[in-house]
Amino acid sequence: QEQFAQDGVPPAAAGVIAPLFTREIQHWAPQIVAWAAEFGLDPNMAATVMQIESCGDPNAVSSAGAQGLFQVMPFHFASGENMQDPETNARRGMAYLAQGMQLTGGDTGLSFAGYNGGHGTAAKGWGAWPSETQRYYTWATGIYKDAATGAGTSETLNQWLAAGGASLCQQAAARLGIQ
């Protein structure tokens, strides 16, 4: 009998990310698998966060000041750490995502919401979330469900790309030298 997580999504095959992620995310696949394993996370969950946050651009910076592959806020780093170093950024991002999984009893949706809006905000429920966190939850849970079930494509990912994600991915591809 197949094991399912609390939210009904089966765990990913060990050591891989789903083929539905964009080429910019696939570029980082071996590292994503290693980073996720270090924190006991499903690599598809980590890939989902990277997809939405930076589309694989290690030098991405948001208007709010979040930086790097996982768009981690500066206060999560120790003094002197390079926030855009992929290894450092991933470890800080994965630690925060793993904290969300612990706080929510393994609820991936609430963990995604917490990653975006803060774990305290996520605990307040949908109605108290900013619209950005509601959108993030919708994108992340849809993409992750498709990825975790082994789908080769994701309608939710396509919707995210059409809603502006494609420009983020074009920027990432240029930075990574992907044609």
Q: How would you describe each model-predicted region?
A:
Residues Q1-A18, T156-Q179:
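An acidic, Gly/Ser/Thr/Pro-rich helix-cap/linker signature
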Residues P30-A34, N44-A47, R91-A98, G109, ...:
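Solvent-exposed, polar/charged alpha-helical surfaces in well-ordered, non-transmembrane soluble domains
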Residues V33, A37-E38, Q51-C55, P74, ...:
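Sec-exported extracytoplasmic/periplasmic mature domains
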Residues N44-T48, A60, G105-G114, A151-S154:
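Surface-exposed patches in mature extracellular/periplasmic domains of secreted proteins
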Residues H76, T88, S111-L161:
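Catalytic and substrate-binding regions of cell-wall glycan-acting enzymes that process beta-1,4-linked
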